[in-house]
Amino acid sequence: MSGTKDKAKGLANEAIGNVKQGVGKVTDNEKLRAEGKAQELKGEAQQVKGNVKDAVKKP
């Protein structure tokens, strides 16, 4: 997978995670909030992975 795809997937996961956290907070659902936080962190990691891939590609 290219760095750009990793970054895009990361942004999507981060956004979905934020939504889950918000819904979990509004509905007082700690499990959903935790799932959202985990997905947000996954998204952040994917973005870092994409940035590293792009950095390695550049001469």
UniProtKB/Swiss-Prot annotation:
Q: Which Pfam families match?
A: CsbD (PF05532)
- Sequence ranges of Basic and acidic residues compositional bias: 27-43
Q: Where is this region: Disordered?
A: 27-59
Gene3D superfamilies found in the cross-reference section: YjbJ
Protein name, per record: UPF0337 protein PP_4561
Under the heading SUPFAM superfamilies, the entry gives:
Hypothetical protein YjbJ (SSF69047)
Family label? Belongs to the UPF0337 (CsbD) family.
Listed InterPro entries: CsbD, YjbJ_sf
Classification of source organism: Bacteria, Pseudomonadati, Pseudomonadota, Gammaproteobacteria, Pseudomonadales
- Its transmembrane ranges are none
